[in-house]
Amino acid sequence: MTPSPFFKKLKTHTAAAVCAATIGLFSSTSAMAADMSNGANNFYQSQQVTIQKVTFKNQYNMDIVGNLVIPKNLNKKTKASAIVIGHPMGAVKEQSSMLYAQKLAEQGFVTLAIDQSFWGESTGQPRNVVAPDIYAEAFSAAVDYLGTQSFIDPNNIGVLGICGSGSFVISAAKIDPRLKAIATVSMYDMGAANRNGLRHSQTLEQRKQIIAEAAAQRYVEFKGGETKYTSGTTHELTANTHPIQREFYDFYRTPRGEYTPKGSSRELTTHPTLTSNVKFLNFYPFNDIETISPRPMLFITGDQAHSKEFSEEAYKLAGQPKELYYVKGAGHVDLYDRVDLI
């Protein structure tokens, strides 16, 4: 994708503002051959970068694990610009984040693709827990790490959030001015999506039923009962499978993007715990979004994306400078990895 003039100009001022201007896709090793139809390239492997596994603490003394991606031609005698990259909600860094991380590193940025707390290789028990404040903290912890590296310019660190991480990076940026520019791709406001559904399709009564189910399940689990999981991506398609679930299935349940991190199982991937998922109902990332200004914000969405309402709402509320960029012909999941569109 060709960068807009707005972000060509920003490139001279800050590293992360341009992070989504060249929407790229990432890769990693997988036991399955990657499905490359429609330009999908989730498991891309760059020959122009080095990848180093790093671990650092967040404020809660939890381990955050990430892949530090460094251009092979980087001059470590100078201070490089850096970008922190967050994966889609329920995913791990090996899904979409590492493609972006490598493509941006090929442009000269040092990038850091992290696993969220409770997911992937990062610590946190129980697994698959929803904790929006801790999710936001992961991005500030990543700045702690990057900003103390001798070859990184601590005043030129930005952040890119994909899908649900788009809302988490906004939450982080509101209280961490070290994030100098903020970009989102196919953003989901995980608070609004869980409270109201897409396009306000969920009623208050339905929301109350979800809350009641989670409350009842807490008793079950407190007494030693089995942990229950919710939402996420279906494991099989039927004639009645919703088109949006089919879109996610094509990425998460096929060789195109399927990845099971060590210590998890295919059955649990993408699924948060039911009792913790209601934490999203108290998550309002767009409140006070205008206070991020004058740091620049970029919202990228497909013009066919079922989720575009969230990027549009964030853009409407954000202060200047800001840009809303539509990728023609792209759906929500297309921007995870379909390089012919992004």
Stretch-by-stretch model annotation:
Residues 35-78:
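N-terminal cap/lid segment of alpha/beta-hydrolase-fold proteins
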Residues 103-123:
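Conserved alpha/beta-hydrolase
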Residues 90-102, 116:
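The serine-hydrolase catalytic nucleophile loop
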Residues 129-150:
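Alpha/beta-hydrolase active-site loop
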Residues 151-163:
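Alpha/beta-hydrolase fold nucleophile elbow
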Residues 330-341:
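Catalytic histidine-centered segment of alpha/beta-hydrolase-like enzymes
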Residues 292-293, 299-301:
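Short beta-strand/loop motif that positions the catalytic acidic residue
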Residues 170-254:
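Alpha/beta-hydrolase-fold enzymes
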